[in-house]
Regions:
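Asparagine/serine/threonine-enriched low-complexity, disordered tracts
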Residues: 252-260
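Bacterial N-terminal signal peptides that target proteins for export
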Residues: 1-9
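Conserved functional acidic sites
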Residues: 23-253
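Hydrophobic h-region of N-terminal signal peptides that target proteins for export
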Residues: 13-21
Length: 261
């Protein structure tokens, strides 16, 4: 999930138990999906899934400092909609209800990308898994491509972990996306236990993740997540506002569902 404008273009137990499955690059690629009971709400302390919540990010400070030429803005909306994704897990076929999270990116006010991302919370570990995304790339107001779109269960793609719940161990490495030749984002834990300030406020108990991809070796991203909030910084983008209006009945999976076909 490295930003389009940049490309341009597990818990400790999980990480240790899956270490034998790590590839030569040292990043864990296979996870104990068979032990998960997946749900589409809740998330975890560093990656909440709260239907109805929207977060707004901007690099206005970077532009004002003369370090960025273009004003980039990002809206992340945790939709009330879910998507059912069917895939092989542990030798059987399972259907997982995922939460739809929309990301809308603009550059100097012009729409550049809208993606619909699919996440589910593994119970009881509360690790949040990433099941894919549908992507629309825009130019001059028209869709011109769908680069980086992928879906677990298709063409050999498998879920990756986007954020473990416990055991944030500095140096841990794992794949967030496992879609051969399409999307292979990886995460490495860099530091934890610090505070940060952004336009939306000051946040404590934060951690930093470095993201890379074997498909674009020169592209390196850094994200900051803070407890109880989620993503606070994405390179030069900073959390500027949080809008929350979840409904009482959003604590179940009886939302509008979209099948994976």
């Amino acid at each position: 999930m490295i930003r389009a404008t940049k490309l341009a273009a597990v818990s400790a137990l999980v990480l240790v138990a899956a270490a034998a499955a790590a590839q030569d690059d040292g990043f864990t690629k296979k996870f104990p999906l068979a032990s998960c009971q997946f749900i589409s709400v809740g998330g975890n302390r560093y990656f909440p899934l709260i239907p109805g919540r929207q977060l707004y990010y901007s690099n206005a400070a970077c532009v004002a400092a003369g370090k960025c030429d273009a004003l980039n803005e990002l809206w992340i909306t945790e939709e009330r909609e879910t998507k059912r994704i069917t895939l092989p897990i542990g030798g059987t076929t399972r259907t997982v209800v995922t939460r739809v999270v929309q990301e809308r990116e603009t550059e100097d006010g012009e729409l550049v990308e809208i993606s619909r991302n699919y996440f589910a919370n593994c119970w009881p570990s509360r690790d949040v898994y990433y099941f894919g995304e549908d992507v629309d790339i825009y130019k001059n107001g028209k869709v011109v491509g769908h680069e980086s779109a992928w879906l677990a269960g298709r063409h050999g793609a498998r879920p990756g972990i986007v954020m473990p719940e416990d055991g944030f161990i500095t140096g841990s490495r794992y794949y967030q996306e496992v879609a051969p030749d399409v999307a292979l984002d990886r995460a490495e834990h860099k530091r934890t236990g610090f505070a940060t300030r952004v336009p939306a406020g000051r946040f404590d108990n934060c951690l930093e993740v470095e993201e890379t991809t074997v498909l674009e070796p020169d592209d390196i991203g850094h994200k900051t997540y803070c407890r109880g909030v989620g993503l606070v910084k994405d390179d030069d983008l900073e959390l500027t506002a949080i809008y929350a209006n979840p409904r009482p009945d959003d604590d179940n999976d009886n939302d509008n569902e979209d099948d994976d076909d």
